[in-house]
Amino acid sequence: MGQIVTFFQEVPHILEEVMNIVLMTLSILAILKGIYNVMTCGIIGLITFLFLCGRSCSSIYKDNYEFFSLDLDMSSLNATMPLSCSKNNSHHYIQVGNETGLELTLTNTSIINHKFCNLSDAHRRNLYDKALMSILTTFHLSIPDFNQYEAMSCDFNGGKISVQYNLSHSNYVDAGNHCGTIANGIMDVFRRMYWSTSLSVASDISGTQCIQTDYKYLIIQNTSWEDHCMFSRPSPMGFLSLLSQRTRNFYISRRLLGLFTWTLSDSEGNDMPGGYCLTRSMLIGLDLKCFGNTAIAKCNQAHDEEFCDMLRLFDFNKQAISKLRSEVQQSINLINKAVNALINDQLVMRNHLRDLMGIPYCNYSKFWYLNDTRTGRTSLPKCWLVTNGSYLNETQFSTEIEQEANNMFTDMLRKEYEKRQSTTPLGLVDLFVFSTSFYLISVFLHLIKIPTHRHIKGKPCPKPHRLNHMAICSCGFYKQPGLPTQWKR
């Protein structure tokens, strides 16, 4: 009994200690909150800006996302697919293997005097390089409704390939008058393969683009491969875009079944733990760059990014070399069948049209991405657009960079939420929901002030007596019935 009395005597001292602890805790919280408010109110950012403005630039966006870029070296792809490039607006090249290629020249000088092309005879006598000729055949078969054979001349003396197409659209009137001719079709195919300003659209008649040029001939010849490409880097995209348009009616599915599958990693990242790495042979100025499964998984979910197309091409090239050990001709035959599983031809055509319209476009050679300095995760690289032959300045697409940073932050929050949900017991979540609901209901009940007893109007509180609706109490203290009452809390 004495212990109980002692305990109750110490209660005021205990309460004083608790109050001291509460005051100390609240003081610490207030100081921390004040420091946070000062850090986020903008004054420190303003002071930093005023101190560094005009002296230093930063590649950090949204405080945590660092801006990087990479340049792809597509010269290694020539083992399995033709690469095209331009020396200038009139001289264009296709590289096949490491030593040979085709030169496509827009010129006003004819090199073949006759007007016929006996291709079947050359094929029967095996006069030409089959790999080169298959590329030429792809170009020729892409010309719509070719039936004017006088528009084409060829010569295969001693294995030398010489093909000459006649062009006749030097001005707006000629282009309009000959819009449906073979020459217009030749120029349209050439314009789709090489993003060149030497050919321009003069008009559009019933959906057919009428193309004009100052040149009279398109000449295709085989050539030894040198360092021709000064105007543009070697790229397979032009030739592959022709292939995809020719074959899309026959290969409807975008996934090549059988020998190769083009899933870079599955949704959980089991195929390639750590993502996908670009090696020295694929990059310019870098030895190695890896992208995690978070970025690469987006390539498997959708077929709508230029960088994903390039990864598929590099992956195709690597697997073809390691598994097939094929010669050039066999590789070209394989890429003919696989093209629709590798690239999105709609993306290629969209970028081509953007170039023709003078809008910044993607040339598939340079990409930018963001790196999260906290987690080390990277975004899926996006194409660094080109206009007037040069890459855009970083400030010209800063809005897209900010949006990508926002997307990465949102994706991080979503993943953290999913992770938290997966590690939290379901019963604990139910208990939290019940306790929160109970608390909100109790607050509501407290706010509505439910009455607890009756008063006689104009009289003081009758407690501890409990009046009934007749204003009387069974103890007899209130015994005058019929007085007006009201509920009170």
From Swiss-Prot:
One of its GO terms (molecular function) is metal ion binding. The keyword Transmembrane applies. Residues 34-58, 452-489 are cytoplasmic. The record marks S58, S59, L257, G258 as: Cleavage. The chain crosses the membrane at residues 18-33, 431-451. The record marks K33 as: Important for GP-C-mediated membrane fusion. Residues 2-17, 59-430 are extracellular. Pfam families: Arena_glycoprot (PF00798). Coiled coil: none annotated. GO terms for cellular component: host cell endoplasmic reticulum membrane; host cell Golgi membrane; host cell plasma membrane; membrane; viral envelope; virion membrane. Belongs to the arenaviridae GPC protein family. Disulfide bonds join C85-C229, C117-C154, C179-C210, C277-C290, C299-C308, C362-C383. This is Pre-glycoprotein polyprotein GP complex. Keywords: Disulfide bond, Fusion of virus membrane with host endosomal membrane, Fusion of virus membrane with host membrane, Glycoprotein, Host cell membrane, Host endoplasmic reticulum, Host Golgi apparatus, Host membrane, Host-virus interaction, Lipoprotein, Membrane, Metal-binding, Myristate, Transmembrane, Transmembrane helix, Viral attachment to host cell, Viral envelope protein, Viral penetration into host cytoplasm, Virion, Virus endocytosis by host, Virus entry into host cell, Zinc. Zn(2+) 1 binds at C57, H465, C473, C475. InterPro entries: Arena_glycoprot, Arena_glycoprot_zinc-bd. One of its GO terms (biological process) is fusion of virus membrane with host endosome membrane. Zn(2+) 2 binds at H453, H455, C461. A lipid is attached at G2 (N-myristoyl glycine). Glycans are attached at N78, N88, N98, N108, N118, N166, N222, N363, N371, N388, N393.
